[in-house]
Swiss-Prot record:
It comes from the Eukaryota. Keywords: Acetylation, Chromosome, DNA-binding, Isopeptide bond, Nucleosome core, Nucleus, Ubl conjugation. Residues 1-28, 36-53 have a biased composition (Basic and acidic residues). The nucleosome is a histone octamer containing two molecules each of H2A, H2B, H3 and H4 assembled in one H3-H4 heterotetramer and two H2A-H2B heterodimers. The octamer wraps approximately 147 bp of DNA. The keyword RNA-binding does not apply. This is Histone H2B.3. The modification N6-acetyllysine is found at residues 7, 37. Gene3D superfamilies: Histone, subunit A. Can be acetylated to form H2BK6ac and H2BK33ac. Monoubiquitinated by BRE1 to form H2BK143ub1 and deubiquitinated by UBP26. Required for heterochromatic histone H3 di- and trimethylation at H3K4me. May give a specific tag for epigenetic transcriptional activation.
Length: 153
């Protein structure tokens, strides 16, 4: 008897090795092939040198804070006392919050009086409305003093 030829099972290619063209043919007729990912306009990949000159770093956005002014006032009042970064952050948030409230109240007052401009009068009235009692009186007097000094200089 002659030896039988050995039968080997047909080797299947792994799915990863199939070319993209064959995959596109197997896609359903109604669907489009997936588009490649793109970056938003104006933003280039890190590897490409588009947009910026090579070697230059991107400039940081400056965030305006009142930290230096808070520190100056602290040193005027208590020269021997320091302030922690967390306390400084709280004070900065406090000032931003107060200014936001005063600006909102001043805008309302200007709208009520049908005026297009916020003047020192609206600011003074909003200080009286937002701040309580004695604090408002001191704030108004200090504000008036600052405006007088500014206009005379």
């Amino acid at each position: 008897m002659a030896p039988k030829a050995e039968k080997k099972p047909a080797a299947k290619k792994p799915a990863e090795e199939e070319p993209a063209a064959e995959k596109a043919e197997k896609a359903p007729a109604g669907k489009k092939p997936k588009a490649e990912k793109r970056l938003p306009a104006g933003k280039a990949e890190k590897g490409s040198g588009e947009g910026r000159k090579a070697g230059r770093k991107k400039a940081k956005k400056s965030v305006e804070t009142y930290k230096i002014y808070i520190f100056k006032v602290l040193k005027q009042v208590h020269p021997d006392i320091g302030i922690s970064s967390k306390a400084m952050s709280i004070m900065n948030s406090f000032i931003n919050d107060i200014f936001e409230k005063l600006a909102g109240e001043s805008a309302k007052l200007a709208r009520y009086n049908k005026k297009p401009t916020i003047t020192s009068r609206e600011i003074q009235t909003s200080v009286r409305l937002v701040l309580p009692g004695e604090l408002a009186k001191h704030a108004v007097s200090e504000g008036t003093k600052a405006v007088t000094k500014f206009t005379s200089a």
